[in-house]
Design a protein with these regions (language model features):
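Short, low-complexity, intrinsically disordered N-terminal peptides in bacterial proteins
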Residues: 1-11, 50, 144, 154-155
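Active-site-proximal alpha-helix that buttresses catalytic centers in soluble enzyme cores
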Residues: 7-86, 92, 128-132, 136
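Short, flexible helix/strand-to-coil boundary loops that buttress conserved ligand/catalytic motifs
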Residues: 26, 101, 122-125, 151
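Short C-terminal domain-edge/linker segments immediately following a structured domain
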Residues: 43-48, 114-118, 140-144
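Short glycine/proline-enriched coil/turn segments at helix->beta-strand junctions
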Residues: 53-54, 78-81, 104-108, 126-128, ...
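Mid-chain, well-packed structural core segment of small domains
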Residues: 78, 84-116
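Non-DNA-binding regulatory cores of transcription-related proteins
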Residues: 103-111, 115-135
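Domain-level recognition of soluble alpha/beta enzyme cores
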Residues: 126-155
Length: 155
């Protein structure tokens, strides 16, 4: 895939934050994970450790639920890198994510974010429309645009 005159290579791990508390009280950005969401994210981390090597870089939304999702996944990964926690990803569109990916060719990159961006990036890279539930993880080969694996907490 070519983005801004860069050929995307490497692997993309797209993570939609796990199940979050309802937004009835307080600000959306501050919503944390439910106990079920924390358990699903930890399970996703154990699964991910069997599928991809240690990530080279991680871009994580600064929303509490996204940070907590990464914190539950990371302990299962070998030599997990510190994430770049960025408020910009909270409102980022697919183009922003693809631009970020273009910055490190050949890397295994993890993006922990929100819908609709996660589904839109997955569709842009693979050419297939697919629903991504809270806590789901997609692993994509960027050079071919092929979906290599998909984990759904409700499988």
């Amino acid at each position: 895939m070519v983005v801004m005159n860069h050929v995307l290579t490497g692997s993309l791990v797209l993570v939609r934050h796990a199940k979050a508390e309802s937004g009835e009280e307080g600000e959306d950005h501050a919503r944390g994970l439910t106990s079920r969401g924390r358990a699903a994210a930890a399970e996703a981390g154990r699964w991910l450790a069997t599928v991809v090597p240690a990530p080279d870089r991680v871009w994580c939304s600064s929303a509490a639920r996204a940070v907590q999702t990464w914190e539950a996944i990371a302990p299962s990964l070998p030599a997990a890198v510190a994430p770049v926690v960025d408020r910009a990803l909270y409102l980022a569109g697919p183009h922003d994510v693809l631009q970020w990916l273009a910055g490190s060719p050949g890397a295994t990159s993890v993006v922990v974010g929100h819908n609709p961006t996660v589904e839109q990036v997955l569709g842009s890279v693979t050419g297939e429309l697919r629903g991504v539930r809270p806590g789901a993880v997609a692993v994509v080969d960027l050079a071919s645009g092929r979906l290599l694996d998909f984990w759904d907490p409700q499988r």
